């Protein structure tokens, strides 16, 4: 049983522009949401509030606090007290010990991962099967570019999207932190029974170790960002066998890691350098 407690993603703020004129500016929302599991406080998330139940569920999944969705009895979000109450079927094992080994990440909004996730990642090897075509990369980039987003209205948010192998858009989520957006998509996938092995995950944020770990936990083998990456993000992608593509803007991109899935199927013509005139003689 879950509530449907989405909050408005933006608010209107009256301000003055560079000419001193009064204007109305759209601003991204941001709200604290404290997560309680079986009446135990786990953490407080700073979130846009657009998909709070999916966010909480995805967080529990990606942190391996809950192994099966059947173990979750209910998620109740109450914005009057800024709290999400999760009830599980049989409680969480070793919660105190796990809470004591949280690692603060580089994600916007101060994300955290539990220390044992770094050990769990050693057991993950993504299957090498499947293709990710250059034409598919371009198609999903176009879908993102034309998608109506909070970022276009207000800025100040990150976006994540999950695509089918044919570049069909399955989910698109924005939040004040990219780790929130990926957790919300993880929650939606879990609720809908969507498997990740043949999907493509897109993010506007940089490819940090946290992003790669979460994608690997979701069994996603192809991760794309319009931004760059960190050394540890690349290291983990190599370890688990993930296709990693960064700096994907318009028709430019960098294949940062690929165990053989990526297929170049679009001919590209190098742009000729502009002609330069010879310097005038003196």
Regions found by a protein language model. Give the residues of each.
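A short acidic/small-residue loop/turn micro-motif
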Residues: 50, 177-178
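Feature captures the catalytic cores and cofactor-binding loops of soluble hydro-lyases/lyases
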Residues: 178-268, 277
